């Protein structure tokens, strides 16, 4: 325990003071608004027809914040269904949104300063690249071919509000900011937002995603901090005694020599004593822990993780959230893909003089497939088809222009093909394209009060062009003037596109 506390003090964030007066500056909220517009997800105000940013309303909020009764109402009436004593639903939602966005901007400042002031400046870009979503699939494709066991982890949720505040209290000393954060959490938990009753922690309210992401990332970073400590303590490379380390190497060499003499008896024991090769990958609420160790070692890690959540976060999690499987015989879903590492047999005919014989070679391949049923379920949820995959019209889009309808359907289709470009089998994507294409035709026919057949004949090739700009054409346009690419047989080629910054509900149905 003393060793852990010393490690914790060395690697954790230093305590920071939040710049609390920034909450009273108008430019903070303007900056938060501009950040939302330039980001991948637009921040919308629920209940308002005009979704433009209003500097006048921000100035009114600043005036009310300087009044003494404003903060008294927040403390004495934190469980009100409306904010700031306003009867108007628009004012309540607008002020709630800009306060949470501005607060999220302020609380992120100490964490950004820590990354900039890190003494190991040369290692920062490498660390960020490893944590990027862009590197996940190439990493899995390169490393998982040499591993044996896989632990598929579902990070437990929801976490109690007080635990979230305690995690932040370790790093900050600004009491007013913590009180304001407590108010936001109590206010939105009463609205059944992301912490208390949502099925998934990532289905956040649109107007407060930035703040909730910050809180969730704080929780996950704390959990991974403990996991990193356990990983380093389990490695023999962390031993401080050089004599013990040399003895471990000599003992391992003796075991290898003994294993050559008695291979049947010693094959499974050798990897339990030697330092296991472990890899950890996480995105959103799912994580993968893979290694070359034995099944007994993986069961011990499962016990460590369950007790970690129980004693460090006061959170009881079911052991069923951690699935242990042999990598060669299991299929796991991650980032919207069904992935596996099957063993394929390859027969090679060898000719030596007058004799010929066949060599059976076993090869591993990282296989990724498109999940058909969940994707059709997502399309049905978005009202593009029925639950069985039969295309239907989209009545809510009939008020749009023909070009906007074509553009929306075409964009969804291109995004699906773009994201699943790394799939080893793409026949499923053509079924999704058929659903979207016929749904688009039914929507246009319903708008113009015509039949689908007549409308498709009238549109002709213009209608088809919106649905045939696939990944091969996009990729060839990017390199048209520099390099020639032949995309014949592209159904067997895999190209991982690295510009996917987020995954919407249609391409991430499994989480």
Swiss-Prot record:
Gene Ontology molecular function: any one: RNA binding
Keyword Chloroplast included in the entry's annotation: yes
Keywords noted in UniProt: Chloroplast, mRNA processing, Plastid, RNA-binding, tRNA processing
Transmembrane listed as a keyword: no
InterPro entries: Domain_X, Maturase_MatK, Maturase_MatK_N
Covalent S-S links between cysteines: none
Localization in the cell: Plastid, Chloroplast
Pfam families: Intron_maturas2, MatK_N
Protein's GO biological process: mRNA processing; RNA splicing; tRNA processing
Residue ranges of the TM segments: none
Source organism, top-level taxon: Eukaryota
CC per GO annotation: chloroplast; plastid
Function: Usually encoded in the trnK tRNA gene intron. Probably assists in splicing its own and other chloroplast group II introns.
PANTHER family in alphabetical order: MATURASE K (PTHR34811:SF1)
Family: Belongs to the intron maturase 2 family. MatK subfamily.
Protein name: Maturase K
């Amino acid at each position: 325990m003393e060793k852990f506390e010393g490690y914790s003090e060395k690697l954790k964030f230093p305590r920071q003071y939040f710049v609390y007066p920034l909450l009273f500056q108008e430019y903070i909220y303007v900056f938060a608004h501009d950040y939302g517009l330039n980001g991948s997800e637009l921040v919308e105000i629920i209940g308002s027809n005009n979704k433009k940013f209003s500097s006048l309303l921000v100035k009114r909020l600043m005036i009310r914040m300087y009044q003494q009764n404003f903060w008294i109402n927040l403390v004495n009436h934190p469980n009100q269904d409306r904010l700031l004593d306003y009867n108007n639903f628009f004012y309540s939602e607008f002020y709630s949104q800009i306060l949470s966005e501005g607060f999220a901007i302020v609380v992120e400042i100490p964490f950004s300063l820590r990354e900039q002031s890190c003494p190991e400046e040369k290692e920062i870009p490498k660390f960020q690249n490893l944590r990027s979503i862009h590197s996940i699939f190439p990493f899995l494709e390169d490393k998982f071919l040499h591993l044996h066991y896989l632990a598929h982890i579902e990070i437990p949720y929801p976490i109690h509000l007080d635990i979230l505040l305690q995690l932040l209290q370790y790093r900050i000393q600004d009491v007013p900011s913590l009180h304001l954060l407590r108010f936001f959490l109590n206010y939105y938990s009463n609205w059944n937002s992301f912490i208390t009753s949502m099925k998934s922690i990532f289905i956040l309210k649109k107007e407060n995603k930035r703040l909730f992401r910050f809180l969730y990332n704080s929780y996950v970073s704390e959990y991974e901090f403990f996991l990193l400590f356990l990983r380093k303590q389990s490695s023999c490379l962390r031993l401080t005694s050089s004599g013990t380390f040399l003895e471990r190497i000599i003992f391992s060499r003796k075991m290898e020599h003994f294993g050559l003499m008695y291979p049947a008896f010693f094959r499974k024991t050798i990897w339990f004593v030697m330092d296991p090769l472990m890899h950890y990958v996480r995105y959103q609420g799912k994580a993968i822990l893979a290694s070359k160790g034995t099944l007994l070692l993986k069961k011990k890690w499962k016990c460590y993780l369950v007790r970690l959540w129980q004693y460090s976060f006061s959170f009881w999690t079911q052991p069923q959230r951690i699935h242990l499987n042999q990598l060669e015989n299991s299929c796991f879903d991650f980032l919207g893909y069904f992935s596996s590492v099957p063993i394929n047999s390859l027969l090679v005919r060898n000719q030596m003089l007058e004799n010929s014989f066949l060599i059976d070679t076993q090869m591993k391949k990282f296989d990724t497939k498109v999940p058909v049923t969940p994707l059709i379920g997502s399309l049905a949820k978005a009202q593009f088809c029925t639950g069985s995959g039969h295309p239907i019209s989209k009545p809510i889009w009939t008020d749009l222009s023909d070009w906007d309808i074509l553009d929306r359907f075409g964009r969804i289709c291109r995004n699906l093909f773009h994201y699943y470009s790394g799939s080893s089998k793409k026949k499923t994507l053509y079924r999704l394209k058929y659903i979207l294409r016929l749904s688009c035709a039914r929507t246009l026919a319903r708008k113009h009060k015509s039949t689908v057949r007549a409308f498709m004949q009238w549109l002709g090739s213009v209608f088809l062009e919106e649905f045939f700009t696939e990944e091969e054409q996009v990729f060839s346009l990017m390199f048209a003037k520099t390099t020639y690419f032949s995309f014949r047989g592209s159904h067997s080629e895999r190209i991982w596109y690295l510009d996917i910054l987020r995954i919407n509900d249609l391409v991430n149905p499994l989480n």
